């Protein structure tokens, strides 16, 4: 697939690719954003029929295995690994539908702040604050900031965090031949290992908190569980990491300047948008395409494009001007080839906001329950572990609170 060169506002050619698309979308150069958006989407549009057939075939394979293993459908088959009832999946979509107003308000607010007559999909990622560089600090200072932010988790967590810092669990900096990004790897009987590519900016500080959340989840689980029960599910994995991110943000807000607060709150609002709303939008699309296959129909590009445009209108509201090119976006989402996976991002984020809120509000035994959750590993089904710790995802409350309380409060500020 060959993507075009596009012009920026200075008339210079800029490469468009999946690798730099997000970088272009966060540029303050609106012409570059617009041209990158149209260049990428029109390229995918050329292959719309091939990609629709590929996705259709993938769904048929999943449906075959679901039937062969005596499941009602692909949804039930995919959720069975974590013992998640399909009603939770449907309830998640329904709850987000009932709470789309905060997202509509956020899009309208961002349109107003940016002073745009029309707000397009290529405007969504534009920063509304230039304060990112003001958070620059070296790694030693980043460790101090993360340690202070996570102090509400108590002595045991602090001691384990300090052990990770002191005993060099972390490969910190970019290096020749080193992979990009960041991740944590837990190994039973050995301390966790963390890979970073640290840069002096807030996102890297947040990544440190995030990955140490994974690492200490593994640390407490391995310390408390047998080998068989030590490995926690993906459904639970992002809870520990995201809780740390939220605690860091709340801590940083306390001493932030007005401009820094705008940056931080926008970071949080974007996290809610991309991790809850957008992932549930994906989850709803997945349900649609697999239902089509279950009904014996083949996925057609026109059908998928129509559904995707309607979905964006519903989710983002009247403040978003929906361009025709947006219809092709479904074809560039690789998660759709791993059926019914993305909903876990939304449930994980919602659980994390519930834990962080309870901890910061000093609710009775909130820290004790949370640490018990970390130490429980995979000793029970995910929903049971979370419910024991005080977060019941079989009810709409955690998702509703995430959509309403956090998003609305942040937008108001």
Range-by-range predicted roles:
Residues 409-413:
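A short, hydrophobic C-terminal helix/tail in secreted or cell-surface proteins
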Residues 195-208:
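Short pre-active-site segment immediately N-terminal to the catalytic Zn-binding motif
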Residues 218-239:
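Post-HEXXH active-site segment of zinc metalloproteases
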């Amino acid at each position: 697939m060959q993507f075009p060169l596009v012009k920026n506002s200075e008339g210079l050619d800029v490469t468009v690719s999946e690798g730099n698309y997000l970088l272009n979308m966060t540029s303050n150069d609106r012409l570059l954003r617009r041209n990158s958006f149209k260049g990428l989407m029109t390229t995918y549009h050329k292959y719309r029929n091939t990609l629709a057939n590929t996705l259709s075939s993938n769904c048929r394979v999943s449906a075959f295995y679901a039937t062969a293993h005596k499941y009602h459908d692909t949804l039930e088959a995919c959720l069975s690994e974590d013992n998640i009832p399909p009603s939770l999946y449907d309830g998640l979509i329904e709850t987000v539908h009932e709470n789309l107003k905060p997202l509509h308000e956020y899009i309208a607010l961002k349109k107003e702040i940016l002073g745009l007559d029309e707000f397009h999909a290529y405007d969504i990622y534009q920063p509304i604050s230039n304060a990112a560089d003001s958070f620059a600090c070296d790694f030693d200072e980043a460790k101090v900031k993360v340690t202070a932010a996570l102090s509400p988790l108590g002595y045991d967590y602090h001691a384990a965090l300090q052990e990770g810092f002191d005993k060099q669990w972390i490969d910190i900096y970019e290096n020749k031949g080193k992979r990009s990004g960041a991740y944590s790897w837990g190994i039973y009987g050995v301390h966790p290992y963390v890979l970073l590519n640290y840069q002096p900016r807030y996102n890297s500080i947040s990544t440190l908190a995030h990955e140490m959340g994974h690492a200490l989840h593994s640390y407490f689980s391995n310390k408390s569980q047998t080998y068989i029960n030590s490995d926690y599910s993906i459904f639970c994995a992002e809870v520990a990491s995201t809780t740390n991110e939220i605690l860091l943000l709340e801590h940083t807000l306390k001493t932030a300047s007005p401009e820094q607060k705008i940056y931080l709150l926008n970071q949080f609002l974007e996290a809610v948008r991309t991790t809850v709303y957008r992932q549930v939008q994906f989850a709803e699309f997945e349900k649609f395409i697999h239902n089509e296959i279950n009904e014996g129909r083949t996925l057609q590009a026109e059908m998928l494009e129509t559904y995707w445009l309607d979905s964006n209108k519903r989710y983002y509201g009247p403040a978003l001007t929906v361009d025709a090119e947006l219809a092709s976006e479904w074809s560039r989402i690789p998660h759709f080839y791993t059926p019914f996976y993305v909903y876990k991002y939304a449930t994980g984020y919602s659980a994390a906001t519930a834990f962080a809120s309870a901890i910061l509000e000093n609710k009775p035994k909130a820290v004790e329950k949370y640490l018990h959750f970390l130490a429980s590993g995979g000793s029970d089904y995910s929903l049971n572990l979370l419910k024991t710790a005080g977060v019941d995802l079989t009810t709409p409350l955690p998702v509703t609170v995430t959509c309403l309380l956090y998003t609305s409060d942040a937008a108001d500020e």
